[in-house]
C-alpha cells in the first residue's frame, strides 16, 4: 500500500483517483502530479514501483496538503473571527458566510429547528 503525505492510498484504484484521497488534491491536481512525475494515470496504486512512489511523493511535497492546508484554512477563519469582520461573525454564529438567504433555508448550517 502506497503511503504519500501521511495517507494510505487505496490499492485497487487508479493512481489519479487514489491521489484524490489526500486532502487538498482534487482531480485536476492529481492529473498534473502524475504528468509531472511521469507516471501513467491508468496504473493502479498497487502496481507502482518504489521509484514511481518516490517521484509522486516528491511532486506532492510541492503542494500544501493535509495538515498544513487544514491549519491554514482554520487560521484564516480564526483571523476573520478575531478581527470581527462580517464573515467572521457569520462563522462564529454558525450561519452561511457567502450571502445565502436564511429566511427559509440553511438548515444544515443553522441546525435542526426547535419548537417555538
UniProtKB/Swiss-Prot annotation:
GO terms for biological process: translation. Residues 106-116 have a biased composition (Basic residues). GO terms for cellular component: cytosol; small ribosomal subunit. It comes from the Bacteria. Keywords: Ribonucleoprotein, Ribosomal protein, RNA-binding, rRNA-binding, tRNA-binding. Residues 91-116 are annotated as: Disordered. One of its GO terms (molecular function) is structural constituent of ribosome. Belongs to the universal ribosomal protein uS13 family. Located at the top of the head of the 30S subunit, it contacts several helices of the 16S rRNA. In the 70S ribosome it contacts the 23S rRNA (bridge B1a) and protein L5 of the 50S subunit (bridge B1b), connecting the 2 subunits; these bridges are implicated in subunit movement. Contacts the tRNAs in the A and P-sites. Part of the 30S ribosomal subunit. Forms a loose heterodimer with protein S19. Forms two bridges to the 50S subunit in the 70S ribosome. This is Small ribosomal subunit protein uS13. The lineage of its organism: Bacteria, Bacillati, Bacillota, Bacilli, Lactobacillales. The gene is rpsM.
